[in-house]
Design a protein with these regions (language model features):
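Residue(s) in the substrate-gating loop at a strand-loop-helix junction
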Residues: 121
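Active-site helix of classical SDR
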Residues: 101, 137
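SDR active-site lid
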Residues: 154-218
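Substrate-binding pocket helix/loop in short-chain dehydrogenase/reductase
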Residues: 77-88
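Active-site-adjacent segment of SDR/Rossmann-fold oxidoreductases
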Residues: 126, 147-158
């Protein structure tokens, strides 16, 4: 997604865990003519998030785009996963994202027509096996950012919630199992998902067009509409679908 925004005149601040991967992405953005700065921080640690946002506020007067793409998934039954695992998922997927947003709101308000992009999931629209805490964290994102959108429309801040289905990324490799460890397995559904560059282009398009919500993926997106308009069909399919 960073590469879709990499162009002359843009200064990208790339932030996540893994300095080497961040720097590699930043260098790829620079080759496309963009300024790019790589900053490592940990969304699961509030003090790390605060240090990151303080660094941004000291060096910049405004933020034109804030795009949340970080997150961690889950592959465990609710009864098997301890509450500590649920808390960790919520800390990364929900509290980390909203802390960054709250801290940077003054810089977003200082911009002209600032835009926020939030990566949720189709699991933010319906529950699904092995994803109880993950789905809860995504449901929470919808509640927060839909409220934020209404609170700041007079500040010309648009909020786009992006709900991907199966995208060919390594997210399932790091999904937490019942022991709170990365499962280390690429799900077949993930491996056969849409290409990540296609997903990134659709995300950027939705953000720049001020779409409020967008669903990205393959035929699994139909489940969103089945849940809304034909609930019995949704539940019939969900019970029979392989959760991986």
């Amino acid at each position: 997604l960073a590469l879709t925004y990499a162009q002359p005149g843009n200064h990208l601040l790339l932030a996540a865990l893994g300095q080497e991967a961040l720097e590699n992405t930043a260098e790829a953005c620079r080759k496309k003519g963009s300024e790019a700065t790589a900053i490592e921080f940990d969304l699961s640690k509030p003090e790390s998030v605060k240090a990151f946002t303080n660094q941004i506020k000291k060096k910049h007067q405004k933020v034109d785009r804030l795009v949340h793409v970080s997150g961690i998934s889950q592959r465990a039954r609710a009864e098997e996963a301890s509450i500590d695992i649920d808390r960790k998922i919520m800390e990364i997927n929900y509290f980390g994202a909203i802390q960054v947003t709250k801290d940077l709101l003054p810089l977003l308000k200082a911009a002209t027509n600032a835009k926020i992009g939030v990566t949720s999931s189709i699991s933010g629209k319906f529950g699904f096996p092995l994803r109880s805490a993950y789905a809860a964290s995504k449901f929470a994102l919808h509640g927060f950012f839909e409220s934020l959108r209404l609170e700041h429309y007079k500040d010309n801040i648009s909020v786009t919630i992006m709900c991907p289905g199966r995208v060919n990324t390594p997210i399932s490799l790091s999904a937490l199992n019942a022991q709170g460890k990365a499962q280390g397995v690429m799900d077949p559904g993930q491996a056969n998902g849409i290409p990540v560059d296609k997903c990134a282009r659709q995300m950027k398009r939705a953000i720049e067009k001020n779409k409020k919500e967008v669903f990205i993926g393959g035929k699994e997106i139909l489940m969103v509409y089945f849940k809304k308009f034909i609930p019995p069909l949704f539940y019939r399919i969900a019970k029979k679908t392989n959760p991986t």
